[in-house]
Amino acid sequence: MARSLKKGPFIQERLLSRVLEMNQKGEKKVIKTWSRSSMISPDFVGHTIAVHNGKTHIPVYVSENMVGHKFGEFAPTRTYRGHAGGKAEKGGSAPKRK
């Protein structure tokens, strides 16, 4: 379910204030954040935000296409290592029937 329009987007205030401060100074530093639920606003474009995935911070360079999405979408929390089971034979496919 989408967030109500009267509430507006959620952006962590400290994160937004840091980015606005850096925009005024003209700096570009990596900013660490644990706020995966913060929405990306146009002020973040061009900055690199290190988003926490539960273990480490993953650097995310914000582009114009990301505006309106949330930071958590770009820092996956789960690693896929393949399904369990026997390994396939070197031939690649099952033997052919006659």
Swiss-Prot record:
Renumbered residue ranges of the record's region Disordered: 76-98
Described function: Protein S19 forms a complex with S13 that binds strongly to the 16S ribosomal RNA.
Keywords associated with the record: Ribonucleoprotein, Ribosomal protein, RNA-binding, rRNA-binding
GO cellular component terms listed in the entry, alphabetical order: cytoplasm; small ribosomal subunit
Native species: Chloroherpeton thalassium (strain ATCC 35110 / GB-78)
Assigned protein family: Belongs to the universal ribosomal protein uS19 family.
Organism ancestry: Bacteria, Pseudomonadati, Chlorobiota, Chlorobiia, Chlorobiales
Pfam families the UniProt entry points to: Ribosomal_S19 (PF00203)
InterPro entries to which the protein is assigned, alphabetical: Ribosomal_uS19, Ribosomal_uS19_bac-type, Ribosomal_uS19_CS, Ribosomal_uS19_SF
Single Gene Ontology BP annotation: ribosomal small subunit assembly
Molecular functions per Gene Ontology: rRNA binding; structural constituent of ribosome
Listed name of the protein: Small ribosomal subunit protein uS19
Gene name linked to the record: rpsS
Top-level taxon of origin: Bacteria
